[in-house]
């Protein structure tokens, strides 16, 4: 007897015995997902989650209606970090099949690397894995990569990455990857993508409680997401030169670790007083944004699991978008809508840049005053390291990267959310 479940789409309401609001019913042919008069992709994703929860380990999507978007919705819900399930679908035409496979490949990289234990993804491993993934999807000869590590970071002026990671026995690293499909080594760098790559965040001396620390293997989710986004953009035909910069460190406690009251002097001359060692993501991103600005690109995008404030505002279903460039923000929101991913703007204004006072340095690494808008002040901090921060810079505070427990749409763990939005945005802007 076959253990494979055939799953069909139905616009009809389930028979009464299945319940008034039944999403799934069964007959002699297999299972029916009742999507309503129009095909509701959210219902498909929720139904797929039910199949996984029930332990149905092999599914074939059968019958009519299974286009790219419907299959993609099912895949997202059915996918489990233990990866014991098998999914097959009806034949698609070549272009549609290529698009579906590209999405799956990019998001599988992102979800897998975020879900891995921190013991398996040290800072240098993260940089190496990201470079290997981009090489695997890019045309031959279009990718070069350099990993700056340990004391070489100091020699080249990347003080933030080194300072955050110096408390760990696992050396910090900066990935400088160059994707150049133009064939011209002197082609201008069109965009720079910067990712926060904190492979484990204990909080440092501003230590986290266990119930906040237990998911901190995922604090490199910004790097995982932006790498997946670039990979998907390449598979969709990105034709301009882009640099990927990952700022990788482990935030640990030791006699060498960063201390409260320390001052970091950055390559652009800015000094930063450390008032909270758990606000470390912005310290490593600052180096990446300085390097990005040195390339004089038209577009800078950074991705980071940066603040609890963004998650408190938006929950797990949206990433936060912060920028001074409102026209570019609208383009990003349009890309998210087209890809059916959650993205929501949070405020970022000039006065937020004045909310980082320090008695001993140019800036503090945390906002001051009562009711500090944490996501906004974190983005404001980053703006000091972007040369032209008012134009062409987007900051994604990745609230929806990882779930500690399953929901009705997602398994526990990484979601891959944002990968498709970033790819869409890159390709659309490059083609203008």
From Swiss-Prot:
The active site is at 208, 282. It is an enzyme of class 3 (hydrolase). Binds 2 manganese ions per subunit. Mn(2+) 1 binds at residues 201, 278, 280. The keyword DNA damage does not apply. Mn(2+) 2 binds at residues 196, 201, 219, 280. The gene is pepB. This is Peptidase B. Its main location: cytoplasm. Homohexamer. It holds the Pfam family Peptidase_M17. Belongs to the peptidase M17 family. GO terms for molecular function: manganese ion binding; metalloaminopeptidase activity. Coiled coil: none annotated. It catalyses: Release of an N-terminal amino acid, Xaa, from a peptide or arylamide. Xaa is preferably Glu or Asp but may be other amino acids, including Leu, Met, His, Cys and Gln. Its EC number is 3.4.11.23. One of its GO terms (cellular component) is cytoplasm. Probably plays an important role in intracellular peptide degradation.
